[in-house]
Amino acid sequence: MTAEQIRLAMENKLEYLMEVKPQLASDDQLYKAAALVLRDLMVEKRRAHRAKTTAERKKRIHYLSMEFLMGKSLKNSLYNLGLVEPFTEALTAFGTTPERLFACEPDPGLGNGGLGRLAACY
C-alpha cells in the first residue's frame, strides 16, 4: 500500500466514520483512522490466508487466552506489515508523526500471567 493510498483511506475513515474534516482532525482521531485502515488491511490478509488454508485443507489450531500483556499494537502492526515508511509519509500530509499517534494508543494489558504471554508468542 502506498502513502497516497493510506492517506486517502484515512481521509475516508475521518470523513465518513468520524464526520470530521481531515485538516481539522486531532491526533486521537488520526490514531483511530490509522488503526481502522490497518485493521482493514489485516482483515484482507486474514481472508486471503483463510481461503488458501481452506483450499489446501490444512488444519487449524485455536488457543484462547485473556491473560496476556501484549502492550500497544499500532507500532508493531505497522512494522510487521512493512508499512512504517508509507504511513510516516502519509501522516506528514496531516501534519503529524507516528510517535504522536503511538502516544494516543491505550495500553490493552489484560492479566499478568505467564501462560497467556507465552501463548501470545506463537
Named regions from a protein language model:
Residues 1-122:
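A conserved ligand/cofactor-binding region detector
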